[in-house]
Amino acid sequence: KYRNQSNMDFFSIDYIDIAKKLFRVLKPGGFFFSFSSPRLYHRMACAIEDAGFDIRDGFIWLYTQNQPKAMSLNHFIKKMPISEQEQIKLGESLSGWKTPQVKSCFEPIAMAQKPVQSTFLNNMLENNVALVNTNIKQGVANNMFPSNVITSESISSVIDRAFLTNKPNKQEKGENNIHKTVKPLSICKYLIALTTQQNSVVLDPFIGSGTTAVACKTLNRNYVGIELNAKYAQIARNRVADQQCAITADFADRQQVQPRLL
């Protein structure tokens, strides 16, 4: 489980192929944000680099609402070929000791960039992308210089002052949203506003329940979303339809169109 070859193959084979397709369609200087688990971030970042991108920075999405996954050893001790008394004694001696999984309270986000043509300035003038918008602010008072730490929940006055974005709620996620890992709208908006201009095109090849599309609509960006799961694709369509902007969503699902990266 902890050294699952399929996970390793995904990043060394499949994810490189995905990143190469994104590299092909991005303009020079275009940005690519990719979320990961802390344990596999290094393999994801290497795959992105191997596809031709430059890793510009790494973001931390900080949160506290998560369940510990460490497992107790009691189940394994009971299966040992020793007496019940020895099992009890061993369990007591290892009380509190669990499998090596601490509570995960952050999600790393790779910030990659397709290499620019000539200089950053010339690339910005030519392609309208390459720089970051430091007019975007963070924190409770919305007055802090943008950083690579983001949180959408109140943690402490010091952290909130510097890094807090708006906390997602049920209305934001949409009715009947069954997606298990809905990204906070505020975090998607932050990353999009930081690196794109109005009327830019944002591509999300794994759009899930549509948070990226909703963020683009509220920020006056165009978007392309791709999703294999038909149920998630419909949730995304519904969320987009609830917005007041007249931008059409085009989500591909397995039953209707063979998904592809443009």
Language-model segments: which ranges?
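Class I S-adenosyl-L-methionine
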Residues: 1-23, 31-34, 39-262
